């Protein structure tokens, strides 16, 4: 589902998205979108995922969420039936005992701390699971709700394929906002003037085109238990006459206009596997990477679904490397002559080679389609040997760098590091990713997050890892950083770790390498899912 918007306003600490004439505003609440009208008595609508069950017609997940809300003292949040248990009710379970709807506003991310609920949703009893229900694509002024939420393990960065039967994307007309949300939106439209229709001066609610896949969203009308009451002076709390869902006639809200689009390809779908991992095919994909992803026009023979996937890949490239390739990542020492898009393809190849989440199969399909569309007199066997050597060196150095920083983090957790009188400044990116590496390292060596650790010790670990990340990201070889750490610690352990990781390669899976891939996946998807997409047009790198 896609919702175009014209402008945004920050009000009471929450971002609101206005349509073109400012007659209606959207805001995010617990992974769902709520639409409110300017006009007194206008329709309020809610768009989002409801939880269902583990199979067709099953409502076990919805029943479990309702029972947990009752058990934890949040009876006020329990819906009247199993058909309307929205994702924001799931968010309430992990939001603390005193949480209300107001506390869920502003994010599409929904935390799932209950392993039983996680087992229902992704068939694994994991903790620290995050469901990402949508995204704000600021470049396009669009809010997007995914067909099925993306499930991410925030501890290690792994992505899971959710049970599709557990979710359904629906639209519901609301008769009132919850009390906390009424206070949030009170006075919202006062500071935003309405833009009247230039042709007839009408101030009727503007039609909003909501774009959905061919499997359109269900239409659910809330069944209100309360008796009819007179309209009050508060525009978002009025009880309107009771409406019942009729099997033979359901209508959309006055402001909604549904448009269908072809199904959007999930480029990270693990069921879509690459046909080959030979170096020659990888070199071809790297050679044509910029043309395949950044070429503005659709070439002959390119399927619509693959064409749509190019935009998704582009946003992932921007998230990892920046709009102009300004964000550093691993493999820079040997890959500095490659574009960010080419380095992205190499990362996807490595993840695919080791059977982690990746989109290399889609890139392979795009490359094959592009090469087939080239004129017959073009020489497609034009990948130079120098480029092949660069690709191999970049892939190997990338995995070795990730492996070294991961094993270093695991080792530092057990070493008594000398305290420093002060810390040198490190980049914000290195600090954030250093924390992610250490969190995964603790999991890898069996240390629980619940074990108390002195704050100064944690800061010391984070400083060393973030400082070393800055060194790697600048293109400095692993060896130099390992030697510096040997001097600091008065120990040869760092250089021994270096020689242990330097022998591995990215093209032949081996046991220790699987741990390295866990770090690579955590850092890569940490950027893809947490870095906002920048504004602007596609820029050649």
UniProtKB/Swiss-Prot annotation:
GO cellular component terms attached to this protein's record: host cell cytoplasm; host cell nucleus; viral tegument
Coiled coil: none
InterPro entries: Herpes_UL21
Assigned keywords, A-Z: Host cytoplasm, Host nucleus, Virion, Virion tegument
Subcellular location: Virion tegument; Host cytoplasm; Host nucleus
Signal peptide (UniProt feature, chain positions): none
Main location, first listed in the record: virion
Entry's family note: Belongs to the alphaherpesvirinae UL21 protein family.
Binding partners and assembly: Interacts (via C-terminus) with UL16.
Job of this protein: May participate in DNA packaging/capsid maturation events. Promotes efficient incorporation of tegument proteins UL46, UL49, and US3 homologs into virions. May also play a role in capsid transport to the trans-Golgi network (TGN).
Protein name listed in UniProt: Tegument protein UL21 homolog
Organism: Varicella-zoster virus (strain Oka vaccine)
């Amino acid at each position: 589902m896609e919702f175009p918007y014209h402008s945004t306003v920050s009000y009471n600490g929450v971002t609101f998205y206005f349509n073109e004439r400012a007659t209606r505003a959207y805001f995010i609440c617990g992974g769902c979108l709520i639409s409110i009208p300017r006009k007194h008595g206008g329709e309020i609508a809610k768009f989002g995922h409801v939880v269902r069950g583990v199979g067709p017609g099953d409502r076990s997940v919805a029943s479990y969420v309702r029972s947990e809300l009752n058990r934890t003292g949040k009876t006020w949040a329990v819906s009247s039936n199993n058909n309307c248990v929205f994702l924001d009710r799931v968010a309430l379970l992990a939001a603390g005992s005193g949480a209300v709807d107001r506390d869920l506003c502003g994010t599409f991310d929904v935390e799932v701390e209950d392993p039983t609920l996680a087992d229902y949703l992704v068939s694994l009893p994991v903790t620290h699971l995050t469901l990402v229900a949508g995204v704000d694509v600021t470049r396009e002024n669009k809010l997007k709700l995914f067909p099925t939420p993306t499930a991410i393990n925030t501890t290690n960065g792994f992505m899971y394929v959710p049970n599709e039967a557990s979710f359904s994307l629906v639209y519901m007309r609301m008769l009132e906002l919850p009390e906390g949300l009424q206070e949030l939106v009170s006075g919202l439209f006062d500071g935003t003037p309405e833009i009247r229709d230039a042709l007839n001066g009408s101030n009727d609610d503007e039609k909003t085109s909501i774009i959905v896949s061919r499997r359109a969203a269900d239409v659910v009308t809330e069944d209100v238990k309360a008796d009819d009451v007179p309209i009050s002076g508060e525009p978002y709390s009025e009880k309107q006459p009771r409406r019942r869902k009729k099997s033979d006639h359901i209508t959309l809200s006055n402001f909604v206009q549904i448009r269908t689009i072809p199904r959007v390809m999930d480029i990270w779908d693990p069921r879509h596997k690459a046909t080959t991992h030979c170096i020659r095919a990888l070199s071809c994909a790297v050679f044509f990477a910029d043309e395949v992803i950044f070429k503005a026009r659709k070439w002959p023979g390119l399927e619509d679904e693959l064409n749509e996937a190019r935009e998704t890949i582009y946003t992932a490239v921007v998230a990892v490397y920046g709009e102009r390739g300004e964000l550093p990542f691993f493999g820079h020492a040997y890959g500095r002559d490659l574009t960010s898009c080419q380095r992205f393809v190499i990362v996807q190849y490595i993840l695919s080679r080791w059977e982690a989440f990746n989109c290399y199969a889609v890139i392979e399909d795009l490359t094959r389609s592009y090469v087939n569309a080239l004129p017959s007199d073009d020489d497609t066997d034009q990948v130079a040997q120098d480029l092949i050597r660069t690709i191999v060196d970049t892939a190997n150095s990338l995995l070795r760098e990730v492996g070294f920083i991961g094993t270093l983090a695991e080792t530092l957790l057990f070493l008594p590091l000398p305290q420093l009188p002060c810390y040198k400044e490190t980049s914000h990116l290195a600090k954030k990713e250093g924390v992610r590496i250490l969190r995964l390292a603790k999991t890898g060596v069996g240390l629980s997050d619940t074990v108390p650790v002195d704050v100064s010790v944690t800061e010391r670990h984070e400083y060393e890892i973030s400082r070393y990340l800055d060194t790697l990201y600048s293109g400095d070889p692993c060896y130099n950083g390992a030697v510096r750490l040997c001097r600091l610690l008065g120990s040869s352990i760092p250089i021994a770790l270096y020689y242990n990781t330097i022998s591995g390669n990215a093209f032949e899976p081996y046991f220790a390498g699987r741990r390295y891939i866990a770090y690579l996946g955590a850092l890569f998807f940490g950027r893809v899912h947490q870095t906002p997409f920048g504004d602007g047009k596609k820029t050649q790198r």
